[in-house]
Amino acid sequence: MAAAVLRAALQDWRSCLGRSYGRRKLSQTQGPPDNPGFVESVDEYQFVERLLPPTKIPEPPKHKHYPTPSGWQPPRDPLPSLPYFVRRSRMHNIPVYKEITHGNRQMTLIRKVEGDIWALQKDVEEFLSPLLGKTPITQVNEVTGTLRIKGYFDEQLKAWLLEKGF
């Protein structure tokens, strides 16, 4: 008796699943709606383009003399034939940065180094040794292409890299 009641309850429950609550099926004979959808207008797209960010940073304009009033200078046209290369940042600047960690540890960071980063480390140590009076403490990360130097030497290293032609 209980099994028969349970079976009947399950059949009623399954029949309810077949129905979709709150939705109705459209008949096959019904045609497309009279709504045309959307109209594409090319005339106003110029206003949309103004809102979209540019996909690439534009090349800097040509100037009559360098460095510019802001101090920017382009890389030398024939690139230096060194075993390493320091690529410019996306804003066309030399990627040398100041970094402070742990509240008082001052570091200078050279990023975007391609090629023999160990040769760059050796050249940087030779350049900074007379300024410091000792060999600077450096850290090389070959995977990320970065060179860290203990202390703030960003202005000296930027001038040195510009002099080398990067």
From Swiss-Prot:
Name recorded for this polypeptide: Large ribosomal subunit protein mL49
Gene Ontology BP terms: mitochondrial translation
Record flagged with keyword Phosphoprotein: no
Annotated keywords: Mitochondrion, Ribonucleoprotein, Ribosomal protein
The keyword Glycosyltransferase belongs to this UniProt entry's keyword annotation: no
Pfam families xref list: Img2 (PF05046)
Family: Belongs to the mitochondrion-specific ribosomal protein mL49 family.
Compartments where found: Mitochondrion
Assembly and binders: Component of the mitochondrial ribosome large subunit (39S) which comprises a 16S rRNA and about 50 distinct proteins. Interacts with OXA1L.
GO cellular component, one term: mitochondrial inner membrane
Molecular function via GO: structural constituent of ribosome
Gene3D superfamilies assigned: SUI1-like domain
Chain positions covered by the region annotation Disordered: 54-77
